[in-house]
Amino acid sequence: MSQSVSERTRIKSDRYESGVIPYAKMGYWDAAYTVKDTDVLALFRITPQPGVDPVEAAAAVAGESSTATWTVVWTDLLTACERYRAKAYRVDPVPNSPDVYLAFNAYECDLFEEASLSNLTASIIGNVFGFKAVAALRLEDMRIPHSYLKTFQGPATGIVVERERLNKYGTPLLGATVKPKLGLSGKNYGRVVYEGLKGGLDFLKDDENINSQPFMRWRERFLNCLEGINRAAAATGEVKGSYLNITAATMEEVYKRAEYAKAIGSVLVMIDLVMGYTAIQSIAYWARENDMLLHLHRAGNSTYARQKNHGINFRVFCKWMRMSGVDHIHAGTVVGKLEGDPLMIKGFYDILRLTELEVNLPFGVFFEMDWASLRRCMPVASGGIHCGQMHQLIHYLGDDVVLQFGGGTIGHPDGIQAGATANRVALEAMVFSRNEGADFFNNQVGPQILRDAAKTCGPLQTALDLWKDISFNYTSTDTADFAETATANR
């Protein structure tokens, strides 16, 4: 017969003695723990404070991200405390990083509200990053179990349906961000959209910080963009679009802008990561209900994703955003102006595009994970790329990607349409050569393919001449722990 509550509360043991005892002794460390299929797993990179045992640091993170507080509380005995305690079950030293460890923690699935990214993150990252026992802490990876994953809707549209709508297969999609980001009038903004789409791009895009400022209110931007889209589609016979940024101060205003975009004929809208998890999930539900494609700009992510020892690895954001329901997310370029180690970027793209993940330590993927029926998310490569890098972009990123050439389109000396044409010709020439078996990534072959294509395309020749020496060869701050890799454009 089970014990009554009064009987249980009288039990005395080392674990339930009043006062402060180590987290590991409170039950948050269990080296013999057998991981269940239904457990949420989290991998933390932990730098303990001097003198703090790494096992105790891992147990502290497990405790403070689940049920623990700083002292023993008797009300634990009123719960299924053994079940609800997170368990740190493995601690490994990080190669070539003294006093830094990888801690594997397991969480009972019932600790989290179904389909709530806000609740999941409130536990996993809510309190532990300011914990004094650790000098630095980074969430490196997570495994979301099938049972919990199925409560999320996933991307509203997905890669396959998007390609069906565009009737475009076997090649990356092309886009550009309107530049300058801020200051254009609505009429001039719409002209940029028209010129870029008519020149051969599939998409134009608002930048992260264009919302509804005094120089151009959102309705003015939306209307002029749709005019440019419709005129370019009529002129080219292709399906065209522009990511209309509906990010706003309140969800009421976000929905208002989304409904207006739909009413005037847009088939896609855009939001920023800085909106927050609840807002992202909310508009993702709206996008699915209204058959709209949802583009996410990762604005603000590097404030907590870039540093190697503290914050949240972007691969975790990729998982969270795919669960939340976005169709596109900016995920790095390798060769552009933004942070991007080749192996890390490939890992991000795998997380967004694969239906099943296998452990791949060089790519930073630490857990097997089945994405169940959640659709795939299209990565977007944007930031400091140009047509002269086309062979590198296709090699590193593959076909299921949107290549966004902002300055690499609008900065063309002969105008926006010429810049778009240069990118379209470069892409088609490289894809054709690849399909014919050319060793296009070879630094002798790839550039020659572009030079040959430029013989019959003046805009491409001009672009190659202008940007031929432009590259961003900086060492990444975040690199693989289990493989050596170069970040250079090669």
From Swiss-Prot:
Checking SUPFAM superfamilies in the record gives:
RuBisCo, C-terminal domain, RuBisCO, large subunit, small (N-terminal) domain
Q: Lipid metabolism among the record's keywords?
A: no
Q: Where is substrate annotated to bind? A: 127, 177, 181, 298, 330, 382
Give the cofactor note text.
Binds 1 Mg(2+) ion per subunit.
Q: What class of enzyme is it?
A: lyase
Instruction: Detail the disulphide connectivity of this chain as listed in its UniProt entry.
Output: none
**UniProt keywords, alphabetically:** Calvin cycle, Carbon dioxide fixation, Chloroplast, Lyase, Magnesium, Metal-binding, Monooxygenase, Oxidoreductase, Photorespiration, Photosynthesis, Plastid
Q: What is its EC number?
A: 4.1.1.39
Reaction(s) catalyzed by this protein?
2 (2R)-3-phosphoglycerate + 2 H(+) = D-ribulose 1,5-bisphosphate + CO2 + H2O; D-ribulose 1,5-bisphosphate + O2 = 2-phosphoglycolate + (2R)-3-phosphoglycerate + 2 H(+)
Q: Which GO MF term does the entry hold, naming one?
A: ribulose-bisphosphate carboxylase activity
Q: How does it assemble?
A: Heterohexadecamer of 8 large chains and 8 small chains.
- State the remark under miscellaneous: The basic functional RuBisCO is composed of a large chain homodimer in a 'head-to-tail' conformation. In form I RuBisCO this homodimer is arranged in a barrel-like tetramer with the small subunits forming a tetrameric 'cap' on each end of the 'barrel'.
Task of the protein: RuBisCO catalyzes two reactions: the carboxylation of D-ribulose 1,5-bisphosphate, the primary event in carbon dioxide fixation, as well as the oxidative fragmentation of the pentose substrate in the photorespiration process. Both reactions occur simultaneously and in competition at the same active site.
Entry's HAMAP family? RuBisCO_L_type1
Q: What is this protein called?
A: Ribulose bisphosphate carboxylase large chain
Annotated organism of origin: Thalassiosira nordenskioeldii
Name of the gene: rbcL
